[in-house]
Every structure is written in C-alpha cells, then in structure tokens.
Amino acid sequence: MTRPPLVRGIFSLGLSVAVLKGVEKTVRKHLERQGWIEPQKVDYELIFTIDRLKNLVDNKREALTAEQPDAGELSWRKVFNFISRQSSELDARIYVLILLLSFLLPIAWTVLDGDRETTLEDKDNDCNVDLIENERRLKHYNDGERAVLQFGKNRSEPIILSYKDMNVLEGEHEFTSKEEHSNSHLTSKSENALSQVGSEDLLGCHLEKQLEEDKNEPNGEADGEDDNNREKDCSSSSEVESQSKCRKESTAEPDSLSRDTRTTSSLKSSTSFPISFKGSIDLKSLNQPSSLLHIQVSPTKSSNLDAQVNTEQAYSQPFRY
C-alpha cells in the first residue's frame, strides 16, 4: 500500500508535464519557423521576394478598397478581420508576454490597492488617536478645576487653576475691618451709657438722702430747696452735655450708626431722662434703665443648615463653607 502523499505528488507532477507538452505542441510551429529549437539555414533572397509580394498585395487591396463606394464605412466584420490578421502575424514572445501580464496585473492591482487602503487606514487611525489625545488633554481636569470652569463668578475674569486662598476676599476683608471698627465704637458707646446711668443712680441716692433730711428739719426748708434747685440745674446741664456728645458722635460716623439703628435707638431710649425734675423723684424709674439695657454688638446672621454640596461645588471658588 502506498501512502496518500506519494500519490498526490505523482499526480501533480504528471499533470504539470502534460500541460508543458500541450503548450510545446501549440507553439512548435512558430518556434520552428523562428529557429528557436533547431538552427536552420535561411534563404534571404526568398524572404525578400516574399516581402515584396506581400507589399504588392497590400497595395492592390488598398487601391481596391479606395475605389469601392462603401470603403469609408466601418463594420464589425472588418474589425474582426483586422484583429485576426494582426494576431496571426504576432510573434510568440508577444503571446507569452500577454499571458504573463494577464496573470500578473490583477495580482499587482490587488496588492497595491491593499497597501493603499492600509496606509489610508493608518493615517485615519493616527488622526483619530491625535484627536482623542487632544480631547483628553482638554478634558483632563480635576474636581477643583472643573468647579472653577462651571461655577465661575464672572466670565470676564481670568480662570485661575492654581491654588488660591478664598476664605477671605479683599472686599470681605474691608467689610470685616469696618464691622470690627463699628463694633468697637458701639461697645465704647455702651460703656459710656452704662457709666452715665451709674452716675445718675448715685445722684438719685444723694437726692433721696437730702429729701429725708429736709423732712426731719422743717426749719431748713428754704436752704434745702435752694440746694435741690442747684442739683437739678447741675443734672440738667450734665444731661444736655451728654446728649450733645451723642449727637456729635452720630454725625461723625453715620455709616456705623446706620448699620445698627436698633442698638442706637435702644441706647438713646435707655440713657434719655427728663431735663427738669418736677415733684417727687421716682428712684425705681432711675434704677430701671440699667437692668433693661440691651446691648447688641453685631446683627444676627441667618444660616441654612439644609444645604447639600457635592465634590465639585465643595472645591469651587465662589462658594464658602
């Protein structure tokens, strides 16, 4: 038993030999005439005479076709005759060249077309990769940078991607300094008002003692009344001076007083007393303003405790948390 590969090899070899023999038989006539297989003697005189006769026949044919009326017309029969005549006169080398070209041209076309498509695809891939990398560079921001781009205060302002302390701005710093100055001024005014109330309490106690002495000594009523009038005049003059000072301070700093109108009104109401005392002096009314005095240094600020913030808003510059 022979192996299958050996049978296949013998069959392919025999087929190739048969093809070569068939090609040799078909081309032998042309090859023998040209002298490729066996060199033979050539009679050049016979060749020249044959060429002359051929030229004469061609000239006669052209003259006859020119004399015919339908010589200018073209038909498929004439075309076929011309092609067959020219193909019969071709050399065998031209036949081989035509066969090779007919086999090689489609292969070369497909190879070149495939290379061109691969180059175009490579260029497209390179362009796509460059575009993707550029988009990644443009979109590669962290949370803080995206927050600056999304939640910027003003589009005309430049975008600052570096770190910047946004806890206290310049305008807020000026506002806080003004607020501290106004608070210090209000505390100084409240202290002055408290000192004035304390001095008036002492003055009221002194007046009460003098009234008791006047009741015990009926003989010195006239002297006591003169002393009371003098003390009333002194207290009224001191109150007028204090009120004039308060008015000057209020006109000197209208901004600080306009921010806290409630506190100033409460201070004025607590420190204001009647200029002239008529009749009996109520010591409880004198002592009452000191206990009801309400001092408010800064206004209350409302806070929203229900706010929910994500990471981009937490990193954003316009917000403070």
Curated annotation (Swiss-Prot):
| GO biological process: one example | autophagy
Q: Taking the first listed entry, what is the main subcellular location of this protein, grouped into a coarse class?
A: nucleus
What segment(s) does the record annotate as region Disordered? 174-194, 210-275, 299-321
Which segments cross the bilayer? 94-114
Cell compartments where the protein resides: Nucleus outer membrane
Positions in coiled-coil regions: none
Could you name the Gene Ontology cellular component terms for this entry? nuclear outer membrane
Biased composition annotated in UniProt, kind: Polar residues: 184-194
- As given in the record, the signal peptide range reads 1-22
Q: Where is this region: OSH1-binding?
A: 139-195
Segments of this protein annotated with the region VAC8-binding: 233-321
Q: How the protein sits in the membrane? A: Single-pass membrane protein
Q: Where is the composition biased (Basic and acidic residues)?
A: 174-183, 242-262
In terms of domain of life, where is this protein from?
A: Eukaryota
Q: Where is the composition biased (Low complexity)?
A: 263-272
Q: Which residues carry this modification: Phosphoserine?
A: 156, 199, 285, 298
Chain residue ranges for the region called TSC13-binding: 73-125
Keywords from the UniProt entry: Autophagy, Membrane, Nucleus, Phosphoprotein, Signal, Transmembrane, Transmembrane helix
- Provide the assembly information: Interacts with OSH1, TSC13 and VAC8.
Function recorded in the entry: Involved in the formation of nucleus-vacuole (NV) junctions during piecemeal microautophagy of the nucleus (PMN). NV junctions are interorganelle interfaces mediated by NVJ1 in the nuclear envelope and VAC8 on the vacuole membrane. Together, NVJ1 and VAC8 form Velcro-like patches through which teardrop-like portions of the nucleus are pinched off into the vacuolar lumen and degraded by the PMN process. Also acts as an outer-nuclear membrane receptor for OSH1 and TSC13.
Protein name per its UniProtKB record: Nucleus-vacuole junction protein 1
Q: Which organism is it from?
A: Saccharomyces cerevisiae (strain YJM789) (Baker's yeast)
